[in-house]
């Protein structure tokens, strides 16, 4: 086996597959891609509707648990991360959200020069093949296919939710990934011709045909090898046997927001006190490694449905068999969607320049494990505030790479985060009370009509909120003036040569949306930096900001007003 390559990429996930493809494309560089997991060739991964299976499987995901969270009545939350070709893009819900333009301008304000929306948009476009073709915002011939599932045609509840949002005084948006994120509209997904568009399918399949790319599965990366403040390779373990492989040019960590800080710390790069307590020799004291941890939380608003039109009638074995058979034969129908086909992004209060609350609408009432939430028909809205103030951390407690790191998000630890949740619940009730839902809306199952006071809402959220599985920001990019910055603008580790981190851990702050699309964008942009390519020319595409954002929470009045909030 060859032991020396030009580039070693650790993690064949959302970012690593992109890097493997882009760095191997010219044929002049020899690339080694290391993945702890195995093949993604499974109907449970490839068929979009089966998304709950890989997410909850030991075979395809690291099944992490958080430390007991003080803000959640000491509950520990589930935190699965992909451990398979494609990484979390092979186990996620396939929701395609780029985030708001202001999220990226915020990165620049945080010191990540070169990552403004105008500079990121060309890379979003390069990665994407939007089913309706390219325009100023959307890509038309990129590797990742995106669509709206079944275009909301298989259930009237999708459109009813959009109509209810407009009746509540919010705008409609035809494309939240384009000019206007704020508002109610169709939701987009990484599904291409009925099949999950993971980065394994989109990038790695074609790259694996090249002789200069070597992909090794079932490999545990134990640490980065550091010599004189330079990364020279990695120590790996295969079948219990430990060996070293070397990089002539660079080592690239794409192990995710849990795995990358863990690996840096195991390599002696991180907060000195953490390393010493774990029995690790300090190679480089970098206090920000594992800090700044952010995530999205969500709850399910669940209602009974008066009409027998929801997916609850499709949960039996016969229905699942018919859906699966049609998908196998035709790659369409209910098997070819994640079922989140309408959505919304709104601001919870006046004075917010861009949305901080996201809705996923589902024409069923079920749990994340795919089981029905209650007997009969129902629908639900997944909702949560997406710009939390709370920050957590990840740290190792042992030099053993097989021991899971400690993960503490410190959820809902500020008063503003608590207030955002109260506003979120009241605003959601008001939206679902609008006339467009009258023909469908039955009893409020969850939270329940008795959850009305601040105290009751706080308690219900603490007991019922779940992670949206968006851990991020643990190796943040920024300026050298910030002592907690881990990476420079080119994703290079401060103080260590020939070592970069490229995945969702590099985000300075979490975007308003799901993380797969921005992670792919980061990898596309970083690939150009690694290769020394001239960055794509910045876009001058405009973006919509609510004209009265400083004084108005929304642009209109609700037909059935229920929410009374002080204007700023």
From Swiss-Prot:
Gene3D superfamilies in UniProt: FAD/NAD(P)-binding domain, Glucose Oxidase, domain 3
Reactions catalysed, as given in the entry: choline + A = betaine aldehyde + AH2; betaine aldehyde + NAD(+) + H2O = glycine betaine + NADH + 2 H(+)
Cofactor: FAD
InterPro entries linked to this entry: BetA, FAD/NAD-bd_sf, GMC_OxRdtase, GMC_OxRdtase_N, GMC_OxRtase_C
UniProt keywords, alphabetically: FAD, Flavoprotein, NAD, Oxidoreductase
Binding residue positions for FAD: 6-35
Source taxon at top rank: Bacteria
Protein purpose: Involved in the biosynthesis of the osmoprotectant glycine betaine. Catalyzes the oxidation of choline to betaine aldehyde and betaine aldehyde to glycine betaine at the same rate.
Protein name: Oxygen-dependent choline dehydrogenase
Native source organism of the sequence: Photobacterium profundum (strain SS9)
Taxon lineage: Bacteria, Pseudomonadati, Pseudomonadota, Gammaproteobacteria, Vibrionales
């Amino acid at each position: 086996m060859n032991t020396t390559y030009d580039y070693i990429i650790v993690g064949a996930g959302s970012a690593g597959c992109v890097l493997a493809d882009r760095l191997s494309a010219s044929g002049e560089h020899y690339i080694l891609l290391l993945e702890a997991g195995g093949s993604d060739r499974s109907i449970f991964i490839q068929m979009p509707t089966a998304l709950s299976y890989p997410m909850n499987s030991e075979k395809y995901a690291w099944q992490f648990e958080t430390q007991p969270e003080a803000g959640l009545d000491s509950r520990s939350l589930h935190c699965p991360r992909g451990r398979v070709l494609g990484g979390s893009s092979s186990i996620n819900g396939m929701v395609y959200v780029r985030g708001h333009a202001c999220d990226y301008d915020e990165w620049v304000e945080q010191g990540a020069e070169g990552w403004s929306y105008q500079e990121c948009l060309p890379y979003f476009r390069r990665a994407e093949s939007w089913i309706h073709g390219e325009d100023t915002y959307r890509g038309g011939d990129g590797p990742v296919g995106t669509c709206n599932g079944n275009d909301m045609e298989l259930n009237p509840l999708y459109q009813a939710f959009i109509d209810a949002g407009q009746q509540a005084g919010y705008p409609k948006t035809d494309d939240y990934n384009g000019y206007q994120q704020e508002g109610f509209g169709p939701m987009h997904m990484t599904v291409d011709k009925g099949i999950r568009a993971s980065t394994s399918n989109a990038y790695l399949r074609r790259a694996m045909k090249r002789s200069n790319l070597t992909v090794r599965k079932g490999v545990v990366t134990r640490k980065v090898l550091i010599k004189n403040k330079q990364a020279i390779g990695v120590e790996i373990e295969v079948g219990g046997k430990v060996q070293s492989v070397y990089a002539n040019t660079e080592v690239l960590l794409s192990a995710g927001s849990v795995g990358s800080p863990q690996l840096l710390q195991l390599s002696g790069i991180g907060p000195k006190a953490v390393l010493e307590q774990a029995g690790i020799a300090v190679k480089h004291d970098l206090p920000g490694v594992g800090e700044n941890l952010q995530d999205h939380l969500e709850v399910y608003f669940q209602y009974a449905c008066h009409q027998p039109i929801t997916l609850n009638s499709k949960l039996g074995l016969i229905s699942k068999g018919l859906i699966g058979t049609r998908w196998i034969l035709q790659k369409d129908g209910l098997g070819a969607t994640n079922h989140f086909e309408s959505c919304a992004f709104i601001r919870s209060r006046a004075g917010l320049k861009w949305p901080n609350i996201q809705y996923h609408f589902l024409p069923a009432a079920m749990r994340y494990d795919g089981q029905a939430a209650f007997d009969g028909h129902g629908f639900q809205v997944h909702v949560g505030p997406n710009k939390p103030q709370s920050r957590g951390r990840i740290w190792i407690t042992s030099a053993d790479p097989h021991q899971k790191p400690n993960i503490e998000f410190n959820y809902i630890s500020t008063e503003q985060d608590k207030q955002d949740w109260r506003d979120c619940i009241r605003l959601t009730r008001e939206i679902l009370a609008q006339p467009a839902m009258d023909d469908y809306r039955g009893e409020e199952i969850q939270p329940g009509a008795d959850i009305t006071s601040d105290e009751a809402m706080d308690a219900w959220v603490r007991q019922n909120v779940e992670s949206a599985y968006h851990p991020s920001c643990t190796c943040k990019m920024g300026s050298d003036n910030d002592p907690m910055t881990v990476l420079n603008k080119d994703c290079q580790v401060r103080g260590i040569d020939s070592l970069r981190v490229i995945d969702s851990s590099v985000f300075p702050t979490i975007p308003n949306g799901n993380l797969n699309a921005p992670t792919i964008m980061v990898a596309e942009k970083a690939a150009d930096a690694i290769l020394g390519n001239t960055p794509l020319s910045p876009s001058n595409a405009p973006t919509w900001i609510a004209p009265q954002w400083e004084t108005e929470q929304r642009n209109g009045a609700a037909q059935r007003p229920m929410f009374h909030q002080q204007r700023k």
